[in-house]
From Swiss-Prot:
GO terms for cellular component: extracellular region. CDD domains: TFP_snake_toxin. Expressed by the venom gland. PROSITE patterns: SNAKE_TOXIN. It is found in: Secreted. It comes from Hemachatus haemachatus. It comes from the Eukaryota. This toxin has a very low toxicity. Transmembrane segments: none annotated. This is Cytotoxin homolog. Disulfide bonds join C3-C22, C15-C40, C44-C55, C56-C61. The lineage of its organism: Eukaryota, Metazoa, Chordata, Craniata, Vertebrata. Is classified as a P-type cytotoxin, since a proline residue stands at position 31 (Pro-31 in standard classification).
Length: 63
């Protein structure tokens, strides 16, 4: 699986074995959904009060 891991669309990495989910965290209270963090995970990270989490399982799907 290949996931974006930086704010820029052309920067990505191959996930380590066992990490089969791409995730993207964005701030909930901003008009443009400012991205906070992207990367690979074994399980989808939990949402937080001010952070929305989106998870997916295809290459580069977390843009």
């Amino acid at each position: 699986l290949i996931c974006h891991n930086r704010p820029l669309p052309f920067l990505h990495k191959t996930c380590p074995e066992g990490q089969n989910i791409c995730y993207k965290m964005t701030l909930k209270k901003t008009p443009m959904k400012l991205s906070v963090k992207r990367g690979c995970a074994a399980t989808c990270p939990s949402e937080r009060p001010l952070v929305q989490v989106e998870c997916c399982k295809t290459d580069k799907c977390n843009w």
